[in-house]
């Protein structure tokens, strides 16, 4: 939880779309090489263009608009999309005059002609940059060959962090109630100063963590849209969910609800936060975190609490539809039953007419003509007797499958050698029986080799098989334990599940 502040926190050198805003920002930039310049602002993890000056004469850059600029950290950006410097905008800086020079001294020469607080902010940025250079210089002169060198560098880092912390505390105290003080406050992490001792005599890390988490969002105004228009808020938000919140989908959902409750529905910060959480957990690569996405859909999108988040109402419908598809497939959910046909029964199914049916109506007629026989041929997923069932959907012609299936064969054989009660319910996603049977024979697939011979299951929709292969692990009760994993993870995960079951 110790923070490392040795980064250039406001840019004197990066960059993007929106427009609108009585404001007048006049910047005199000596030796300016540009013919146009941009006024940009930060918003969560992105940067947007607010205005463009298309005529620069004698270094004079002017941005004007009929509406007020929203509170935030703004940047002067060159025509080559490089940031010259950052400055803040609040209610008192809608008419702002700045001057500097386009050189290595741009930060030192930067002055606000009509805003003392802006100058205090510029001094703060210069202080941070000076401290950063001091540390880098010390690091370059320290060879770091011995433990003594490392200790010296660590001591220097602690000293600089302390200096920055003291400067920031003083700045926040002296300018309390201002927008820029609130922005700098976002960098702060509230640590328990007098940590009590645990029973072992050491500092109680649990109490320290609980205090840190409880006070993490102190003095952060979730009703102020300007809270998200700076370079710090997104990092603070990301750090909270990656390093502070217990890494579990349920805990994450609870914390999202707490944060959303702090923001007022309909405000920009509310919309941005909800859109951010929705995208983050819809696209999460961490197994099980699609549960958070489903929670967001159920709690916000289905209840009208996401109204206005997206301009296109179809996006809301798509989000709900996607979440509803994932809901029965969440880790911990009972697996949807499947009724597949053995690969060796392909010719029998073909003789009944299943492969010749041209549409769903013909397929239905064929099924009902042969109901009794087909029902006897079905291999139900729910009937598989095993401590663990590996459910895999794949295709003979799929390049990735050709790499993954041999790995799965090895994993399965190794599990059998260890006397594990495991079976593989292998579903071929096409209907080219000869090709399937040939692959099975040539590669000696030791699985339950199946396919949807009666066109009965619609596994693509039921199991979200938008690409192949897709691998699930089910327990003896056919509850989903793992999903969308690589073949080389199968044995490791089953070993983990077995170890957990023995505890």
Predicted regions and their residues:
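Bacterial Sec-dependent N-terminal signal peptides
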Residues: 1-28, 500-503
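A non-transmembrane, solvent-exposed segment enriched in polar/low-complexity residues
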Residues: 20-176, 186-187, 191-216
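Non-catalytic, surface beta->alpha helical segment in thiol-disulfide oxidoreductase systems
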Residues: 74-77, 462, 467-503
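N-terminal, charged low-complexity regulatory/assembly segments
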Residues: 144-267, 271, 275-280, 295, ...
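N-terminal "domain-start" segment that seeds a small globular fold
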Residues: 313-381, 493, 499-502
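Short active-site neighborhood of thiol/selenol oxidoreductases, capturing the structured segment around
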Residues: 353-409, 423-425
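Structural microenvironment flanking redox-active thiols in thiol-disulfide oxidoreductases
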Residues: 402-441, 455-461
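Short, internal strand/loop/helix patches
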Residues: 437-472, 476
